[in-house]
């Protein structure tokens, strides 16, 4: 209590002096000191329900959109009536100006369409030439692969023909047998891990 009174006494000289007028009965002026019971009072705002606040905000937004749409509709209607009221020379001049601007825009649009059409034709021709070049390169590569495959098969055939000469057939079977019997090569030997040749020893009968 003493702290409140001292604070009230310290704050009084800093405030402007109250005007010398009779206040209304039952109501204080802005310059009157606060009551003792309200000096340390803290005004707390009332609690707000989040769901109710969300609903109110949605309704307020809908209200603003509706009012804005009505306002725009009213403004457009007023402008249309003013424009209809000014029918005459100004409206005719504006119509002529709009027609001339429309013709200029149509001419520019046609020129732009022709330019884009030419660019498209040039691009398609370029793509066609590139496609032909790719096809020619692909055909050349396939031809080279076919030629390489044919040469490889030809070499295999020649090698097989050379190997066929050493094959044993019915015609040269007897000659090959005689040649093998007349050969002095001895295949009856072995090699040790140390690289020595071991031949079978003949047993005396």
Swiss-Prot record:
Q: Does the keyword Cell wall biogenesis/degradation apply?
A: no
InterPro entries on file: Ribosomal_mS26
Q: Could you tell me the keywords of this UniProt record?
A: Mitochondrion, Ribonucleoprotein, Ribosomal protein, Transit peptide
- Cell location: Mitochondrion
Transit peptide interval = 1-27
Cellular-component GO terms for this entry: mitochondrial inner membrane; mitochondrial small ribosomal subunit; mitochondrion; nucleoplasm
Kindly indicate whether the keyword Ribonucleoprotein belongs to this entry: yes
Q: Offer one Pfam family short name for this entry.
A: MRP-S26
Primary location class:
mitochondrion
- Superkingdom, taxonomy of origin: Eukaryota
> Which GO molecular-function terms appear in the entry?
RNA binding
| Summary of subunit composition and partner proteins | Component of the mitochondrial small ribosomal subunit (mt-SSU). Mature mammalian 55S mitochondrial ribosomes consist of a small (28S) and a large (39S) subunit. The 28S small subunit contains a 12S ribosomal RNA (12S mt-rRNA) and 30 different proteins. The 39S large subunit contains a 16S rRNA (16S mt-rRNA), a copy of mitochondrial valine transfer RNA (mt-tRNA(Val)), which plays an integral structural role, and 52 different proteins.
Which family, according to UniProt?
Belongs to the mitochondrion-specific ribosomal protein mS26 family.
User: What is the protein name given in its UniProt record?
Assistant: Small ribosomal subunit protein mS26
Tell me which species this is from.
Answer: Homo sapiens
């Amino acid at each position: 209590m003493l702290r409140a009174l001292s604070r009230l006494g310290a704050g009084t000289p800093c405030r402007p002096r109250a005007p010398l007028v009779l206040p209304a009965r039952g109501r204080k002026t802005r310059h009157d000191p606060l009551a003792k019971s309200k000096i340390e009072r803290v005004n707390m705002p009332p609690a707000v329900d989040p769901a109710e606040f969300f609903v109110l905000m949605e309704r307020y937004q809908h209200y603003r959109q509706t009012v804005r749409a009505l306002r725009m509709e009213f403004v457009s209607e007023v402008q249309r009536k003013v424009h209809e009221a000014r029918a005459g020379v100004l409206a005719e001049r504006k119509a002529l100006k709009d027609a001339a601007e429309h013709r200029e825009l149509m001419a520019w649009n046609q020129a732009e369409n022709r330019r884009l059409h030419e660019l498209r034709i040039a691009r398609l021709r370029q793509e066609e030439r590139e496609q032909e070049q790719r096809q020619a390169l692909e055909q050349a590569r396939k031809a080279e692969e076919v030629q390489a495959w044919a040469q490889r098969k030809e070499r295999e055939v020649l090698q097989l023909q050379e190997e066929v000469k050493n094959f044993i057939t019915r015609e040269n079977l007897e000659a090959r047998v005689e040649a093998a019997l007349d050969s002095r090569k001895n295949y009856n030997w072995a090699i040790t891990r140390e690289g020595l040749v071991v031949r079978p020893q003949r047993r005396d009968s």
